[in-house]
Amino acid sequence: MHKLLDPGPAVLAEAADVYQYPDGKALTDDSIAKAAEGCVGIVTMLMDPITETVLSVPGLRCVSNVAVGYDNIDVAAATKHGVMVTNTPGILDETTADFAFALMMAAARRVVQGDNLVRGTHFKGWAIDMMLGVDVNHATLGLLGIGRIGRAVARRARGFNMRVIYSDTNPLLPDVERDMGVTRVDMHTLLTESDFISIHVPLTEKTQHLIGAAELAMMKPTAVLVNTSRGPVVDEAALVDALKNHRIFAAGLDVYEKEPQVHPGLIAAHNSVLAPHIASASTRTRSEMCAVAARNLATAVRGGRPPNLVNPEALNVPR
């Protein structure tokens, strides 16, 4: 497994002998499969490709992913081979929502550009038209996806007196919408009316390139796009074109289409705020993610049903 933060290693050590991969770099599926030989379970990170090559290793019973998302794992193949897949939901919701709002505000108010200006000794004094941004307060926030993280972002928006609209294939109950002060709209309305769009959908075949050239063209020229979900949800080439030609005001990104590679156009864009996939990176949250992943795997190793089992069908497959 990759290095885990405490108390993860101690939790696992109580259940099994533990081998830790030393340097934390991303692995290939072949190297993971080789490392998994003789193991009943593995702890994986979101950059690890868990393919059928890995899942067919004899004796492997559980893959514990240290993330909410598990698009790096071939869940269908895992189920076919009777391998349980677990994740770490519910832990990082608030921390990720904090960061989504941080990206939103940094992009809207040009914080990174201002920081670079001062550090580059180009600050010559206050001016009425210097570094003009867009207001967050009383703006319209559009949420693409209103799961746990999306709802956490909506709660924060209330403190800024924002109008919150959302689009999701699984709508909230009317009384929940009323209590949260959010309104469900169609995609066209969300794209055309939002001052800020924050993405909170899982990566699936249907959500890949959910935001492309056509969608970006529908957005306001003063709009800000924020993505803390998964990189391939946004067509980066189309986003680069929209930023370069000022079809939208700015973007705040924590995830990338071909991560860890970043489109050079995003790096060159002065109106992009870029972070290295750190939305959940607070000490408390990451430590708890490691602890939950360890408990998931420890439960499976002991013959139990892990609490965060993604594919319960795997329990019915002889292994």
Regions picked out by a protein language model, each given a short descriptive name:
Residues M1, T44-M45, V66, L103, ...:
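Short, well-ordered coil/turn residues at beta-beta hairpins
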Residues M1-T86, G212, P318-R319:
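An N-terminal-biased, well-structured beta-alpha scaffold segment characteristic
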Residues Y19, I165, P232:
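Conserved beta-strand positions in the Rossmann-like core of class I SAM-dependent methyltransferases
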Residues Y21-P22, V66-A67, V83-E94, M187-H188, ...:
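Short beta->alpha connector loops at strand-helix junctions that form conserved
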Residues P49-T53, T169-G265:
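Rossmann-like adenosine-cofactor binding region
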Residues H81, P89-T140, A152-R155, Y166, ...:
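Phosphate-binding beta-alpha-beta segment of Rossmann-like dinucleotide-binding domains, i.e.
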Residues V85, T222-R319:
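Rossmann-like dinucleotide-binding domain for NAD(H)/NADP(H)
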Residues I146-G147:
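Glycine-rich Rossmann-fold phosphate-binding loop(s) that bind the pyrophosphate
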